[in-house]
Regions:
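Alpha/beta-hydrolase fold nucleophile elbow
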Residues: 2-12
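Core-facing hydrophobic residues within beta-strands of well-ordered domains
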Residues: 3, 28-29, 152-153, 161
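Glycine-rich nucleophile elbow surrounding the catalytic serine of serine-hydrolase chemistry
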Residues: 10-20
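Flexible "cap/lid" loop of the alpha/beta hydrolase fold
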Residues: 19-23, 28-62
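Conserved alpha/beta-hydrolase catalytic His-Asp/Glu region
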Residues: 60-114
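Hydrophobic "lid"/C-terminal helical patch
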Residues: 71, 173, 177, 181
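Conserved serine/cysteine hydrolase catalytic core
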Residues: 94-148, 154-157
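Catalytic histidine-centered segment of alpha/beta-hydrolase-like enzymes
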Residues: 158-174
Length: 185
């Protein structure tokens, strides 16, 4: 048994999963930080909206140069920190006897439980961080989140960042997360 509760921080799908854990195991979670992750209303119709999954089967490339040239952020966005993208790309690949491939698990979306109709009910303090250029910021989903969670969740925006806040503004994001964790401790 844990001696103290934990803080969860998640981006995109990770934020969605962190909110699920905070809802299902409130005795475990002290605070929740969600970074540009949509929490959809229970009546959201997933079948009417385009999804980024499932992932495609693993593809092999003949050279490191070729696979690195294919690296993209998903969803696509411009990024001014090329050095950071190169770093992420370099650590997202591995060489095998069949060639170069991405490290992701192509079984991920088959193993995840869909949360259609799930009503998130976390009660811990929460912070939602979004980039000012994120498509989520002006969406109906954001309006739902602000309405449903305004009593327990703060909403903060990092200027000049899109969905991949941690790539666009890593220092600003780290500072905001650290400030919130200090406030909660």
């Amino acid at each position: 048994m844990l001696k103290r509760k934990i803080f969860l921080v998640g981006h995109s799908l990770g934020g969605h999963l962190a909110a699920y854990i905070a809802s299902e195991m409130p005795e475990l979670v002290s605070g929740l930080i969600i970074i540009d992750s949509p929490i959809r209303p229970p009546d959201y119709d997933y079948d009417k909206h385009i999804s980024s999954g499932p992932l495609r089967p693993i593809k092999y490339y003949s050279s490191k140069r070729e696979i690195l040239s294919r690296f993209r952020l998903m969803p696509p966005q411009e990024c001014k920190n090329d050095w950071y993208l190169r770093f992420i790309a370099e650590f997202s690949i591995k060489e095998t006897s069949d060639g170069w491939r991405w490290k992701f698990d192509d079984r991920l979306f088959r193993s995840l439980k869909r949360l259609d109709g799930y009503g998130f009910l976390f009660s811990c303090p929460a912070l939602f961080i979004s980039g000012s250029d994120s498509l989520l910021l002006a969406s109906k989903i954001m309006k739902y989140m602000q309405s449903a969670f305004s009593e327990i969740m703060e909403f903060k925006v990092i200027k000049d960042a899109a969905h991949h806040v941690l790539v666009d503004k890593p220092l600003e994001l780290a500072e905001l997360i650290n400030m919130e964790l200090k406030k909660w401790n």
